């Protein structure tokens, strides 16, 4: 192999390294980071628009038993009348609140689609779990979880003050059931 051929092949990696280095220097000088256009930015699409961190009080009712949880700054969640709760129970409360903010309903059944149907058809005449969420200024949202859909993958839910019925992923209702169980075992 001649010296010219070897030189012809070896200069390409050097040029590519110089171009990459120049690109990095340009990014440092301008302060710009490369934008990942293939990634989608997160957007909360739940029924509660306020950030979960703003929630300071949660009231959960199941089978006529109400439990009230308060967020106490650094101490985390406490159960009114029961004091501190386990870290696992606190995670259930935090996740349940977060799901109200982040989990978009799978479907919304408008009132006009429900003509001739009663709340009992969705288990909302006697909800499995009812949750009321408050921030420092007052109530944010009150939701009622009914029965599962026929496939068992989702659950019917209504929101106080709003018409219609929502179909929400089953894990949302399961988390609220876990919160209710935490309060009722005390």
Region annotations inferred by a language model:
Residues 1-186:
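A short-motif feature that recognizes glycine-rich, charge-decorated loops
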């Amino acid at each position: 192999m001649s010296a010219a051929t070897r030189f012809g092949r070896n200069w390409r990696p050097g040029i590519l390294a110089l171009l990459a280095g120049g690109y990095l220097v340009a990014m440092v000088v301008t302060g710009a980071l490369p934008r990942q256009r293939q990634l989608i930015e997160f957007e909360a699409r739940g029924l509660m628009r306020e950030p979960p961190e703003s929630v300071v009080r949660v009231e959960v009712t199941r089978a006529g038993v109400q439990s009230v949880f308060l967020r106490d700054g650094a101490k985390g969640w406490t159960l009114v009348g029961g004091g501190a709760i386990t870290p696992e129970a606190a995670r259930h409360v935090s996740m349940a609140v977060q799901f109200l903010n982040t989990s978009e309903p799978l479907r919304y059944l408008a009132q006009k689609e429900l003509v001739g149907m009663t709340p009992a058809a969705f288990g909302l005449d006697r909800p499995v779990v009812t949750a009321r969420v408050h921030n420092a200024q007052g109530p944010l949202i009150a939701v009622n979880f009914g029965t599962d859909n026929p496939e068992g993958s989702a659950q019917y839910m209504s929101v106080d003050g709003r018409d219609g019925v929502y179909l929400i992923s089953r894990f949302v209702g399961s988390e609220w059931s876990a919160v209710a169980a935490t309060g009722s075992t005390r």
